[in-house]
Amino acid sequence: VFAVVPAENASGVTQRYQPLMDYLSKELGVKVTLRIAADYAAVIEGHRSGNIHIGEHGPSSYVRAWTVTNGGVEPIGTPTDSNGVTGYFSVAYAKASAAGAKLEDFKGKNLCLVDPNSTSGNNVPLFAMNKGGIDPEKFFAKVTNAGSHENAVMAVQQGTCDVAFNWWNSEDDSNLSRMVNKGMVKKEDFKIVFRSERIPGSPYIMISSLPTDLKKAITSALMDMQTRDKSVLDKLTDGKSKGFAAMKHSDYQVTIDLQKFVDDLRKKRGS
């Protein structure tokens, strides 16, 4: 069973990932099914219970899964961008017509985060705001979790949020560009008012208790996807990836530190 943390709506997830299920089923000789998860926690819990064997995560949800399974999951690799580089960014979107040009200009407005286990939609923003002296609970009128990256953008579009955090690779490779391609929004309606430093790439991971030969087969199926069936990779990444780059747990040390920071922040706030 394969699951992915929610970035887009269920039909979008199915269209993007079903070719991967067919490809993995063929390569592994065993049927791989797609589980649509309601939130990040459902995928993490699925790994812990052993019901979800392979998953695509953001760095923070991988680290959370690694923590709750006592190291019972391992990263395989992450898709590179069109230049063969791994990693991505957290950005904040506002309406193009909004008065502010940077995050600090949106005092007293409504902020949308994505999910408590989202890296670009929660942890990086909280860290960056803290560093910039912003306490979101006091600085903004209201802070809400949109639930997915698409929902966060839609909230800005509909005016329920003035600013929303999201993942972003480049001008033509982001959640926003995917939504534009699907006809959901217009690019010119939005502007970026914050961009983070580069975040480690979102890993595909598997539970460590799988048989060794199966783990090897899963790894080679993903790492060699570019040569074995490029159409699957293109579907996953909107044709914006040069293939997978191998990742190991130590590559996520910065995310582990970030997770600790956010957890400590929550404890301080008593939430």
Label for each model-derived stretch:
Residues 1-3, 8-19, 199, 206-271:
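An extracytoplasmic/periplasmic, membrane-proximal ligand-sensing/linker region
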Residues 1-63:
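Extracytoplasmic small-molecule ligand-binding "clamshell" domains
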Residues 7, 57-61, 81, 95-98, ...:
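Solvent-exposed coil/turn segments that connect beta secondary-structure elements
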Residues 12-19, 23, 42, 46, ...:
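Extracytoplasmic/secreted proteins, especially bacterial periplasmic and envelope-associated proteins
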Residues 41-55, 68-69, 88, 104, ...:
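Short helices/loops that flank or line small-molecule/ion binding pockets
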Residues 72-85, 191-195:
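A structural signal for short loop-to-beta-strand junctions that line the ligand-binding cleft
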Residues 94-115:
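Flexible hinge/capping segments at coil-to-helix
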Residues 110-213:
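Pocket-lining segment of extracytoplasmic ligand-binding domains
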